[in-house]
Regions:
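Aromatic-rich peripheral "rim/lid" segments of glycoside hydrolase catalytic domains that contact
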Residues: 27-32, 192-195, 199-259
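Catalytic-core region of carbohydrate-active enzymes that cleave or remodel glycosidic bonds
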Residues: 95-103, 160-217
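Aromatic- and acid-rich polysaccharide-binding/catalytic face
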Residues: 9-12, 29, 33-39, 67-68, ...
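Boundary/entry segment of secreted carbohydrate-active catalytic domains
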Residues: 1-16, 28
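Substrate-binding cleft of extracellular glycoside hydrolase catalytic domains
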Residues: 14, 20-119, 136, 196-198
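Well-ordered, non-membrane alpha-helical segments in soluble/globular domains
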Residues: 46-57, 87-97, 120-125, 156-166, ...
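Short, solvent-exposed loop/turn segments at secondary-structure junctions
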Residues: 80, 118-119, 147, 189-191
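Short amphipathic alpha-helices and their capping/turn segments at secondary-structure boundaries
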Residues: 19-24, 57-63, 123-130, 166-173
Length: 259
């Protein structure tokens, strides 16, 4: 990550010392925290949301000022419909999570973070207005669909820039949201075996140039950067590749490219 110089970083279950070391290395980066849980139940959503905020606070409070904001559950909404996903319960969980995390602990919450393209843009103001307006940030997962080999293919562009349709739907409905963060970005199949390192880097840079056009977007957290022995996500891993260097060079502050 030393070569990457990212503007947005997502840390999953960081130790306090590791998170502090990341902040020291990247003082201007926006850092999002996430606590992994294998089960994400939504029964009794209000108390569960508040309890999950309490659980996260044990790490988040010592990291106040180090990690900017924290997510709750991850990719709760999949590729089905509102009734299958229990949107009402997911909304209530997020509201309770944000109210407890922000109101009790003074730590910003990130709403959303649903599966890529899982929720119809118009359904966000319809089903999730309270969660979005309560939380200080809104997270989107942006992945080019399976079988697409570049963000810049037509179907890739539509998926990667889908956050604009979500933002437009919220605006039309009068739902206020905090800044957007693309908390995960990539190809659905992973870039390895799909692209060269140079082509993958070009895609991430292209997306950054698009995000820069929208002042309501903080930036993107690329999925992902993992240890070499991580087999589960090896097709997504950018560690030790030219992608780090090429994107890092793009992210470097110069007179021609202000940071």
């Amino acid at each position: 990550m030393d070569r990457w110089r990212p503007s947005v970083i997502l840390l999953m279950d960081p130790t306090i010392e590791f998170a502090k070391s990341v902040r020291t290395a990247y003082p201007k980066a926006f850092i999002v925290g996430r606590h992994f849980v294998a089960s994400q139940p939504l029964d009794n959503p209000g108390p569960r949301g508040a309890a999950f905020a309490d659980e996260i606070a044990s790490t988040a409070v010592p990291l106040k000022g180090i990690v900017n904001a924290w997510m709750s559950y991850n990719e709760v909404s999949g590729y089905t419909g509102p009734s299958d996903n229990n949107y009402a319960a997911w909304n209530a969980f997020q509201v309770a999570f944000a109210q407890r995390l922000q109101g009790t602990y003074g730590i910003d919450a990130v709403a959303g973070n649903d599966g890529p393209s899982a929720v119809i843009p118009g359904d966000y103001p319809k089903f999730f207005a309270p969660a979005i307006s309560t939380s200080h940030y809104f997270g989107v997962h942006a992945y080019a669909p399976i079988g697409v080999h570049s963000f810049q293919e037509p179907n890739g562009v539509a998926a990667m820039l889908r956050y604009r349709a979500i933002h437009d739907a919220l605006q039309r409905s009068g739902v206020k949201s905090g800044p957007f963060i693309l908390t995960e970005t990539g190809l659905s199949d992973g870039w390895r075996g799909q692209q060269t390192e140079e082509a993958a880097a070009a895609d991430f840079i292209w997306l950054t140039t698009e995000l820069d056009k929208d002042p309501y977007v903080v930036g993107q957290a690329v999925f992902g950067l993992f240890l070499p022995d991580n087999e589960r996500w090896k097709n997504y891993n950018v560690a030790g590749t030219l992608i780090e260097q090429i994107v890092g060079d793009y992210n470097t502050c110069t007179p021609a490219h202000a940071c």
